[in-house]
From Swiss-Prot:
CDD domains: PseudoU_synth_RluA_like (cd02869), S4 (cd00165). Responsible for synthesis of pseudouridine from uracil at positions 1911, 1915 and 1917 in 23S ribosomal RNA. Its EC number is 5.4.99.23. It comes from Vibrio parahaemolyticus serotype O3:K6 (strain RIMD 2210633). This is Ribosomal large subunit pseudouridine synthase D. One of its GO terms (cellular component) is cytoplasm. The keyword Cytoplasm applies. GO terms for molecular function: 23S rRNA pseudouridine(1911/1915/1917) synthase activity; RNA binding.
Amino acid sequence: MAQQIVLTNTVKDSQLGQRLDQAIAELFADFSRSRLKEWLLDGKVQVNGEVVTKPRTKVMGGEEITLQAELEDEERWEAQDIPLDIVYEDDDIIVINKPRDFVVHPGAGTPDGTVLNALLHHYPDIAEVPRAGIVHRLDKDTTGLMVVAKTVPAQTRLVRALQKRNITREYEAIAIGRMTAGGKVDQPIGRHSTKRTLMAVAPLGKPAVTHYRVAEHFREHTRIRLRLETGRTHQIRVHMSYLQHPLLGDTAYGGRARIPTGASQELTDMIRGFDRQALHAVMLRFEHPITGEELEFHAPVPDDMVAMTEALRKDTEEYGLPDEF
């Protein structure tokens, strides 16, 4: 049965000039932007008592926004007994270490077998929290740390912290090619113009900022550490492809196998057989949404990336780095 919700909030003075769809995304952060926009277009949003359906309507600050809508029962998602690697847990949050080949949220082509289905099994009460408490996502084959909220207040505050860029997320990756230095990619990301399942750097896309630094050089690859300011879909993968240094194994974004000259058959087979993007969410730091305590978590790099790193390092020690280094 659908749940009737009526929520009210006031537009902040700092939101002066924002589009209505942007303003309500900040005011009602428990819900996804797509869901809020759907409600807006369906006449479920009132501004000072008047129904407004145009997303581009500007707000001035001080308006009272009322949201009257039906929230579909999230029990339509099946609770499934799927193991979770719990790094930390208390009454308000859970931090998990996600393995590869594990989708975070049900969607087209993946109706179950996801992190969300597992959460509903291990924490039945989390069904009362929008999106079962999921605050941010990792791609199916990206491994590493995610924080999940157990309660609506915890989720609301974590989502706001994410929007304000107060959650630090660091990643370890192996990029193809010789990167000489670190830097920053500040390029907007939007849906790919022809490949609708992929993203791309796009002038009219959403702002996206990725910081990166070189951790270790190999002959034809580079181990890097990255930090996200924003969290767009496939952000690191898109930005590294934009730099012409796609991630090892990421064939969707140009990560074709590159074999160092004279490489052993073992290394050649490992590179050609690495069948996921070499990307791991290694560190997560944020203020606890309820207590305010600063928390920091680390997840060890998974075995497949460790083995690849060791093999590339051995190859580099044998042949040496190119003269440019």
